[in-house]
Amino acid sequence: MFVGVDHGTVGIRFAALKEEGGRVTVFELSRKKAVEMDGEAIVKVIEKGLEIKREEIGLIALTYSMGDGFFTIKNINNVRNRGVRSEKAGSIVGGGTKVFDALENSGIPTIVIPGIHAGSEKIDRRMKFFSHCASPEKVGVAYFIYKKGFENFIFADISSNTVTMSVVEGIIIGAMDACLGSPGLYQGPIDLQLLRDIEDGRVSANDAFSTAGVLRKKWLPGVDDEDLAMDCLSLFAAMEISAMCVLMKDYGIETSDSKVFLTGSAGEKADIKQRIDRLVGVETETLTKYSAAIGCAEIAKDVFYGAKNILGINVEP
């Protein structure tokens, strides 16, 4: 039995992959609920939610926060500061920290997956211009797609924030994080007015980022117009996907030779898909919101059986 953990912005998603028959069970724990629980209670709710016993687990693959403090897949006992350079960026609730610590103290074999950032070894060196490209659960999404038989692809995870990643010949070559390109529902890039607000002390940089999404930023004329917000989200997500197409073309992969996937709470909506398909000129495929957790479970399984490299990320012995 192998378990994957997706530390999302709103909730923490879990997936268990059984060896016999490949049966998958999934469940989601809200970060706010997790923060109220102790370590043993968290392990028990994982057992109940996934319909497993801890003794059955061969390996867990865990993601946490930005994952920018390391660049190889590590045993949880060898990760410093939970694998992050700082806890001050992004949505801070405390539930993910509780889950990390619960698994670290549980005795269950656990590995931690890094994010994609300037320290990543195999990404395009030009992408290292940005300190951070994608958080660790996006590696899980990419592996979920890879295990379906795709080696050249792009995916956009459109939810609280938007992150788009490209993979060429089974190697992650680049990604664009929420603070760089397309906004999400709640989080987004910091523009000129937000820079002024930060400089004037009206808002912190983290709060500015956390309220720069299409549903939180004060940009809609008059009353809230959700259709305009979704149209805006689709446009910028399509532009970000197109940017990844340019990167892949530089590797000799035309858009017609690759596949584009959508996931996330907004990405899985039919109207968002239709808009993006029209704008990019491709037929995208929608993934389950549990794709990151399932992909992480697949990583756990393959590492357990000796995999030394996952999508260009080395596995520490």
Sequence positions of predicted segments:
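Glycine-rich phosphate-binding loops at beta-strand->alpha-helix junctions
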Residues: 253-276
